[in-house]
Curated annotation (Swiss-Prot):
Classification via NCBIfam families: 1-(5-phosphoribosyl)-5-[(5-phosphoribosylamino)methylideneamino]imidazole-4-carboxamide isomerase
Keyword annotations: Amino-acid biosynthesis, Cytoplasm, Histidine biosynthesis, Isomerase
InterPro entries according to UniProt: Aldolase_TIM (IPR013785), His_biosynth (IPR006062), HisA_bact_arch (IPR006063), Isoase_HisA-like (IPR044524), Isoase_HisA-like_bact (IPR023016), RibuloseP-bd_barrel (IPR011060)
Compartments where located: Cytoplasm
Protein name as catalogued: 1-(5-phosphoribosyl)-5-[(5-phosphoribosylamino)methylideneamino] imidazole-4-carboxamide isomerase
Catalytic activity from the UniProt record: 1-(5-phospho-beta-D-ribosyl)-5-[(5-phospho-beta-D-ribosylamino)methylideneamino]imidazole-4-carboxamide = 5-[(5-phospho-1-deoxy-D-ribulos-1-ylimino)methylamino]-1-(5-phospho-beta-D-ribosyl)imidazole-4-carboxamide
GO molecular function terms noted in the UniProt entry: 1-(5-phosphoribosyl)-5-[(5-phosphoribosylamino)methylideneamino]imidazole-4-carboxamide isomerase activity
Catalytic residues (UniProt): 8 (proton acceptor), 127 (proton donor)
Length: 235
């Protein structure tokens, strides 16, 4: 199992949101690359980056910060937010991003996502509220079940599914292990839990489950409720 510490970018700064609400943003750093470097020092192999402005605009909006992160650390970069076409995918890969997350487009155009997954390192982001898929930066909840969307990408060549329970995101209230497991079982794709990590017990619970391939850690690191160095030791 991997732990993927997260950097959410808004207006060039590292922030965290509560339940995906942009006006809830709390700034943690004016220099996100320094945060990424800290993750590397603590033992991480990955950094999970979300371009929040990009997610709402539908196009890249924090390129300079992403470039700085790439230039200043050796972490593998997983990036999502506002990736809607092949040109953007190619641009980010040329920049040195290792894996790209397709979210809203996976609901609206799954054929496109499957095509991209056959050519590039792609993860599918499934963000859900009460089991239903949310799109467009979580501003809109669809009528599709998250497990049905996961099933759509079984055997499609995607590297991973990143599964976020929006109701828990940024709330430090514990990971929704059952929901994450349901996505993993529906898709048979490596599934990464996101949303709600509070402390080391969440890491232990996800690892013990056996069907969860990774956990994204955000606010728990920034607020100091999870010792990342300790977390890496139990993997």
């Amino acid at each position: 199992m991997d732990i993927l510490p997260a950097i959410d970018l808004k207006d060039g700064k590292a922030v965290r949101l509560s339940k995906g609400l942009m006006d809830s943003a709390k700034i943690y750093s004016d220099e996100p690359w320094q945060v990424a470097l800290r993750f590397e020092e603590l033992g991480s192999k990955w950094v999970h980056i979300v371009d929040l402005n990009g997610a709402f605009a539908g196009k890249p909006a924090n390129l300079e910060q992403i470039k700085k992160i790439r230039e200043n650390c050796n972490l593998k970069i997983e990036l999502g937010g506002g990736i809607r076409d092949e040109e953007t995918i190619k641009m980010y890969l040329e920049l040195g991003v290792d894996r790209l997350i397709l979210g809203s487009i996976a609901v609206k155009d799954p054929i496109f996502v499957k095509k991209m997954a056959s050519k590039y390192p792609i993860a599918v982001g499934i963000d859900a509220m009460n089991g239903m898929v949310a799109v467009e930066g979580w501003a809109e909840v669809s009528t599709m079940k998250a497990t049905d969307l996961a099933r759509e990408f079984a055997n499609a060549g995607v590297q991973a599914i990143i599964c976020t329970d929006i109701s828990k995101d940024g709330m430090l209230c514990g990971v929704n292990v059952e929901f994450t497991e349901s996505i993993a079982l529906a898709s048979s794709v490596d599934t990464i839990a996101s949303g709600g990590v509070k402390d080391i017990q969440d890491i232990i619970n996800c690892k013990a489950n056996g069907n969860i391939s990774g956990v994204i850690v955000g606010k728990a690191f920034y607020e100091g409720t999870l010792d990342l160095e300790e977390a890496f030791k139990i993997l």
